[in-house]
Amino acid sequence: MLIPRKVAHRKQHHPKRTGAAKGGTRIAFGEYAIQSLESAYVTNRQIESARIAMTRHIRRGGKVWINIYPDRPLTKKPAETRMGSGKGSPEWWVANVKPGRIMFELSGVAEPVAREAMRRAIHKLPMKCRFVTREGGA
């Protein structure tokens, strides 16, 4: 699982999920990519699940790059706890993904194989995404 080793502060404010992605909107490493169309929190488990779905489909061929990292803790208070008495403890780590962000990249396989691998990975993610190629768009 992707989790930061050391953090300056255990708890953070919730980031805004509005607006488009400022960076990471172009394919940097691979030939094919998954681009987000909505904003969402993507947990470390969802990232790992999508990675496994892709790598199992492409088998030995190809290389996968993960361009998002879950660097924000989300907190939760225990069940049946009264209101107040501080913020809850960190439960899971999320990446704040905005529309237009390239999340996963893939190269070294044919386009039909890449399209199917990415389709399987998209089903593991909590927002609408699309398959894009380096040549241009969907």
UniProtKB/Swiss-Prot annotation:
Gene Ontology cellular-component terms listed: cytosolic large ribosomal subunit
The protein, known as: Large ribosomal subunit protein uL16
Protein source organism: Parafrankia sp. (strain EAN1pec)
InterPro entries reported for this sequence: Ribosomal_uL16, Ribosomal_uL16_bact-type, Ribosomal_uL16_CS, Ribosomal_uL16_dom, Ribosomal_uL16_sf
Keyword ATP-binding: no
Family: Belongs to the universal ribosomal protein uL16 family.
Function: Binds 23S rRNA and is also seen to make contacts with the A and possibly P site tRNAs.
GO biological process: translation
Subunit architecture: Part of the 50S ribosomal subunit.
Biased composition (Basic residues): 1-19
